[in-house]
A protein has these predicted regions:
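ABC ATPase NBD coupling module
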Residues: 63, 76-91, 108, 116, ...
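ABC ATPase C-loop
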Residues: 160-161
């Protein structure tokens, strides 16, 4: 179990006299992620969803500080411990495709991710992994500058699948993808969850979240406003704000009904 307990993230602000003060961005955030489940972290822009993922991996910018506790299987993790877990126990799929090294081919980047986790990094296996994301094996010879944004997103998702991490922290993983590719990618995440990985997925897309996630955690004004199963949201439970958001979606109208994903 990966647990965030009373996590607070604050940003440093300086007056013209150089005095520093701290402004809270996230306050008293508590949530749990179990192996085998997908939890969708939803909320508007600027709510701090990405910062919460970064805090788990000690990737916060220098002008931010974190309070509270992040634990793995009941054991609190210090900054150094969380840093050591990156890439194998905790895998991060960032929002920006700039995370790909512009000087390395796709093959070298995927191969490195596989080797760091003790996995087979043969060209054949890497090519098979790309095909699962509807990318030709020839993509292995490409550099990031030769990829579209959607292709780069799928390459980043491949790194998570290759590593076999216990917990995957995915930030806006479906950004820049059309619905067909977004559903393909989320279906692959569901397969990883079915094999035992816990997935914390940041998204703005509540409709996709309800289709693919097991639970919804909603942030509003820097705090957790809702924690509930997707089933309960469909039944009309949750805060007034979350229910209004859900009922405003085209998917809520029977004319645009979308099948549930099991």
């Amino acid at each position: 179990m990966l647990s965030f307990d009373h996590v607070t993230i604050e940003a440093a602000h300086y007056s013209w006299l150089g005095r520093r003060s701290w402004q809270p961005l996230l306050t008293d955030i508590s949530l749990q992620l179990a192996p085998g489940e997908i939890v969708a972290l939803v909320g508007g822009s600027g709510e701090g969803k990405s910062l919460l993922l970064q805090s788990a991996l000690t990737l916060l910018p220098d002008n931010l500080r974190m309070g509270g506790t992040i634990s793995l299987d009941g054991t609190p993790l210090c900054d150094a411990s969380r840093a050591r877990l990156r890439g194998h126990t905790l895998c991060y799929v960032p929002q920006g495709v700039s995370a790909l090294n512009p000087l390395l081919t796709v093959e070298r980047q995927l191969g490195r991710a596989a080797r760091l986790c003790g996995q087979n990094a043969s060209r054949e296996r890497l090519g098979e992994q790309l095909l699962r994301y509807q990318l030709p094996a020839a993509t292995l010879d490409s550099y990031p500058r030769q990829l579209s944004g959607g292709m780069a997103k799928r390459i980043l998702a491949c790194t998570a699948a290759l590593g076999g991490a216990r917990y995957i922290l995915a930030d806006e993983i479906t950004a820049w993808l059309d619905e067909e590719l977004a559903c393909l990618l989320l279906g692959q995440l569901r397969e990883l969850a079915n094999r035992g990985s816990g997935i914390l997925w940041v998204t703005h897309d509540l409709a996709l979240a309800v289709r693919f996630a097991d639970r919804i955690v909603a942030l509003h004004q820097g705090k957790v406003s809702d924690t509930l199963s997707c089933h309960h949201l469909r039944q009309g439970q949750g805060s007034e704000m979350l229910r209004a958001h859900w009922q405003a979606l085209p998917e809520f109208n029977s004319l645009f009904s979308v099948p549930e994903v099991s």
